[in-house]
Amino acid sequence: MKGLVRLLTVFSLLLGCWGWLGTTQIAQAGSLQSFLVPQIPVLAIERQNRADAKLATEFGEKIDLNNTNVRAFQQYPGLYPTLAKKIIQNAPYGKVEDVLNLPGLSDGQKQLLQSNFDKFTVTELEPAFNEGDDRFNNGIYR
């Protein structure tokens, strides 16, 4: 009896795998047009955040006394860290010349600042550059 069950099982599997001996239907390729969504042109505008917009102005080329961090002053001898710290702590400024009114500046420091006026600019305070303590420690360590 077990032999008959095995033979019947093997025969039915072979018959099923052969597809009833060629009686299967031919596969028809479907059209993709029924699945495609019609293409509609989208008019997109270039989005830019306020920080990127500010970097495209003078801010990206000069030191902005209201928004730049302390490390930016390293490239100018004599400004980092003492004068840079004073400048940042007493911001905001209305114009570049206002930096000469800082309390406790010596005549030498004032002359140093005046000699670098062409490297400074003043723009409105931007929260993206002033939030937290990023102006004092922007997390760049060497």
Curated annotation (Swiss-Prot):
Gene Ontology cellular-component terms listed: extrinsic component of membrane; photosystem II oxygen evolving complex; plasma membrane-derived thylakoid membrane
Annotated membrane topology: Peripheral membrane protein
Keyword terms: Electron transport, Membrane, Photosynthesis, Photosystem II, Signal, Thylakoid, Transport
Subcellular location: Cellular thylakoid membrane
GO biological process, one term: photosystem II stabilization
Signal peptide limits: 1-29
Classification via InterPro entries: PSII_PsbU (IPR010527)
Principal location listed in the UniProt entry: membrane
UniProt keyword Transport present: yes
Subunit structure: PSII is composed of 1 copy each of membrane proteins PsbA, PsbB, PsbC, PsbD, PsbE, PsbF, PsbH, PsbI, PsbJ, PsbK, PsbL, PsbM, PsbT, PsbX, PsbY, PsbZ, Psb30/Ycf12, peripheral proteins PsbO, CyanoQ (PsbQ), PsbU, PsbV and a large number of cofactors. It forms dimeric complexes.
Sequence similarity: Belongs to the PsbU family.
General function of this protein: One of the extrinsic, lumenal subunits of photosystem II (PSII). PSII is a light-driven water plastoquinone oxidoreductase, using light energy to abstract electrons from H(2)O, generating a proton gradient subsequently used for ATP formation. The extrinsic proteins stabilize the structure of photosystem II oxygen-evolving complex (OEC), the ion environment of oxygen evolution and protect the OEC against heat-induced inactivation.
Protein name, per record: Photosystem II extrinsic protein U
